[in-house]
Each structure stands twice: as structure tokens, then as C-alpha cells.
């Protein structure tokens, strides 16, 4: 899996430039020639759209303008990648809704698997034209990590515009030292990351480390390297990393548990009491209505929700899971015994609010 940010593809005068993309394409070709399968997650559609209608970003609502620019630039982005390869390049646009919904998640995995079987090169981007919440900091970094797990990738390579992770921002701190090997993403390591590193893209080093943590939970190592350096990219094509290696977690979690842990969450939560919290965290139990204190938001049956301990600072999030009942239903059955569900609601989807197979403790 290779993630390429828009700062490596955007031309100084607007639009897209093959300057750094060519070297990255050669890295891809070297891996393909070695018999490896590869998927690209590429930003750059908005930057390409700005060259087509430069004034679009100055007119109308900011989100709507970015969505329009993404629609304008997506074809140019795919054309940029296609020019480097003889094999067909397949455009795949995803949103967090696709990754949140289990059925669509599995369909996306099946489609990507078939594209790879057919010898195509999938190029994935966020479907910014229909996304709203997703147009946020570092979205494609996190998207790359989730897709890496989705396709069972062996490694996640993130091309950036600096030489990897440093102990501090090397552009402002001359004492910053490079970190070649990161065995574990500790709070101290995360604190070394600053904010957004580019005027073009939306992701900084912090989001790249968050992506590495998500990939690591699936047993996937992450490699950060400078995509602007031809020497670095050529060395990488020969399996020599000049950047930062971030090790995967020692304990790999099951694919479904990974999806439960990292799939985007609906704007909702189930509030539970101390007894339910102890049962979830200590016994691996399902969540029953008797331990439920209430619900936040307006989620539906089958939505991914957070499970929070009530009466704590910020309602501490203990777990995530797929709710068997809507927020409205949960408010009505909260604190009741499971056998009362049908009498209260007039129907029942089972005794559990969240079954343990659909739940992961954080």
C-alpha cells in the first residue's frame, strides 16, 4: 500500500505535476515487476481542480467549493497516474460511510481483490464530492491505513515531503534528530508530531502516526519516507529504507475486531453504568439493557456507536460496537431487564443491546 499526499503531486503554479509522481511510479513498477501487488491511495483531486477553475475556491461555501474542485480534478488525477503504467489504472472512490457499513466494507474488499486479480492498479481517493465530515485533517492518511487492513497489505508506505519522523520539527528546530526506527507509538512519540505540514494537503505528521497506529493494530508495518527525494525513492525501490520504520503491534487483532475498532463512528453513543462497564471490560460480556443509562445522538439499529461510561469527564469511551437498537429504542429500554424489551417496544431484536461479537473494548 502506497499513500501519496497532494503536496507531492501539486504543481507550483496550480494543477498537477509529474515531477515527483514519476519517481513514485517507478517505485510502484519495481514492486509490480517483483511480483508484488500494490494499491495506491492518492490525494490531489482538489489541487487539480483549482487549475481548471482557479476562482472556484473563492466563491460559495468552502465545503461545497472543495467538493466541486474534487469533482473537477478527479479525472486529471487518475490520468496522471495512468500515464506512467501500461496496465490499467482503476479509480476507486470511497467515503467513511463505505467503511462504516459492514456490507459495503466487504463489497469494497471484494472489488479491490478482483481488480488485483485482474492485474489492474487500484488508485483510491476519498469521494470528496459527496463527503462532508470526511473533508478534515489527514483523512487520506487514515483512509490508507484502513484500506491497508481491508486488503491485508504487508506494509503501508507513506510518501511525505520530509525525511520521516523527527524528534521535533526540523524546519524550525535545528536540534531535531531523525528517528529511523520506532518500535512502539508511545505518547512521547506522538507528541513529537506537529500540525499540518503543507499548504496544499490536509494531513500533518500527527495524522500519519495515527494512521500507523491503525495499520499496526492489523499487523501492518508503516514506512515514512521523503517522496520528493529521487535518491530516497530509488533506494526504496531496492528495498532500502531511508526514512522511518514504525513497527506493527505485537498482537494482531482479528479482522472483524479491527473493523469494529477503526471504522468511522456515527454521531452517537450508548451510556452505561459502572456494573456494565465492569462486565464489558473484565468478563467480555455483551451489553444488556439493564446496564444502559441512556443514549446520545440519533443513531439507528445497525449503526456503529461508542459505548461510554456515564458521569465521567467527557463520558469516558470504553468500547465501540454495532447497536442492535436505535437511540430512541435504547432510551425506552434503558435500565430494564431483557425480558421486558418486547413489552416496552412491542418488538424485540434480541436480549442484547450490543452483542459481544459486535463489540470491541478500547
Curated annotation (Swiss-Prot):
ATP binds at residues 3, 160-161, 202-208. The keyword Isomerase does not apply. GO terms for molecular function: ATP binding; glutamate 5-kinase activity; RNA binding. Signal peptide: none annotated. Keywords: Amino-acid biosynthesis, ATP-binding, Cytoplasm, Kinase, Nucleotide-binding, Proline biosynthesis, Transferase. One of its GO terms (biological process) is L-proline biosynthetic process. InterPro entries: AceGlu_kinase-like_sf (IPR036393), Asp/Glu/Uridylate_kinase (IPR001048), G5K_ProB (IPR041739), Glu/AcGlu_kinase (IPR001057), Glu_5kinase (IPR011529), Glu_5kinase/COase_Synthase (IPR005715), Glutamate_5-kinase_CS (IPR019797), PUA (IPR002478). Its EC number is 2.7.2.11. It is an enzyme of class 2 (transferase). One of its GO terms (cellular component) is cytosol. It is found in: Cytoplasm. The keyword Membrane does not apply. PANTHER family: GLUTAMATE 5-KINASE, ISOPENTENYL PHOSPHATE KINASE. NCBIfam families: proB. This is Glutamate 5-kinase. It comes from Xanthomonas euvesicatoria pv. vesicatoria (strain 85-10).
